[in-house]
Regions:
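Secretory-pathway luminal glycosyltransferase catalytic domains
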Residues: 4-16, 20-23, 63-206
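Leloir-type glycosyltransferase catalytic cores
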Residues: 6, 283-300
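Active-site rim elements
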Residues: 26-31, 182
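A short, glycine/small-residue-rich beta-strand->loop->alpha-helix junction that serves as a flexible
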Residues: 29-38, 65
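Histidine-anchored nucleotide/phosphate-binding helix
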Residues: 36-48, 192-196
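A short beta-strand-loop structural module common to alpha/beta enzyme folds
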Residues: 52-63
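Short, aromatic/basic amphipathic alpha-helical patches
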Residues: 64-76, 219-227, 287-292
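Donor-binding and catalytic core of enzymes assembling or modifying cell-surface/extracellular glycoconjugates
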Residues: 201-285
Length: 300
């Protein structure tokens, strides 16, 4: 059997040293929590389909410090490793690890379904198409392995005591980063007005909106039309999985074009949930991803 040799780093995460190939599939993990979950789900589904081990390369987080690995807050299955940067495998002392499939586009990349052990993948994989065959298992593994904070437990009690709707407002780098703002459309207040009106039409009971945002002051000021609304601002950037769990605990979800709240809505276990999503996620029409919004989400 082909083998990846691992040694434990000072943080307890194995470090890849040398290997000609490996007995499993290797997926790169990068970016924020929403993208990390898409990458894990596609990776895990691939390893299940092949019946082989899963190795998750987390070197990206050593190079980009504005994001943190959050997968270890979940019950994921696989080996996390970091170590020699991939380009060093060109050196004679570090033979090339595996053939790489790199895909950051928006259509379904069929190459992943022809994966073989020993291959390495880097991509976003932003569609449930990649893991739909293993939905229940992915749901079980993408559940928290760490307890919620006391503040989050108090919010959960509020959520469970009423008909709750999670509303997520994504601004952050969509506004502040010029490169990102050229790619992603920003959901304006009129989107949330239309989405909340649509949801109220479909729900017979009075609802309470729980408002989540990376700019909670702006969201509170500009979404006053929601009416019965509770802003949630108790976790910050260091524990994003807590906000994700709180949004998933609501009865219904209104999401922007954000993979973070996409996962909260997808993980929502309510069989009668209503999820409202924007129809447009990208500014450029040629970047449109028709596969990112599941069939049971409603677009406005």
């Amino acid at each position: 059997m082909k083998e990846v040799r691992l040694r434990t780093s000072s943080e307890g995460i194995p470090t890849l040293r040398r290997s000609l190939c490996c007995d499993g599939v290797i997926f790169d993990v990068m970016a924020g929590l929403g993208n990390q979950l898409f990458q894990y789900a596609a990776a895990r589904a691939t390893s299940l389909r092949l019946g082989c081990p899963l190795y998750l390369n987390i070197d990206w987080f050593d190079r980009y410090t504005d994001r943190e690995l959050a997968l270890n807050a979940f019950k994921i299955v696989g080996t996390l490793f970091r170590g020699t940067k991939w380009e060093k495998f060109r050196d004679r002392n570090y033979p090339r690890l595996a053939p790489r499939v790199e895909y950051l586009g928006n259509d379904i990349d069929q190459r992943i379904f022809a994966a073989q052990p020993g291959m390495r993948f880097m991509g976003n994989w932003q569609s449930e198409v990649y893991f739909r065959a293993f939905t229940q298992q992915i749901r079980e593994e993408v559940s928290l392995s760490v307890p919620l904070s006391e503040n989050s437990r108090r919010v959960i009690d509020q959520i469970l005591s009423r008909s709750a709707v999670a509303v997520h407002v994504r601004r952050g780098d969509y506004i502040a980063d010029p490169a990102t703002s050229k790619i992603y459309a920003t959901c304006a207040p009129d989107y949330y007005q239309r989405a909340s009106a649509k949801l109220r039409e479909m729900v017979s009971t009075d609802v309470t909106f729980f408002l989540f945002s990376d700019d909670i002051d702006w969201a509170t000021q500009n979404l006053k039309f929601l009416g019965n609304c509770i802003p949630v601002d108790c976790n910050g950037r260091n524990r994003p999985w807590e906000d994700l769990a709180l949004m998933a605990a609501c009865n219904h979800n209104i999401i922007p074009n954000s993979t973070f709240s996409w996962w909260a809505a997808w993980l929502n276990p309510n069989p009668n949930k209503i999820v409202i999503s924007p129809a447009v996620w990208y500014i450029q029409p040629n970047m449109s991803n028709r596969n990112i919004v599941p069939n049971n989400f409603i677009t406005v």
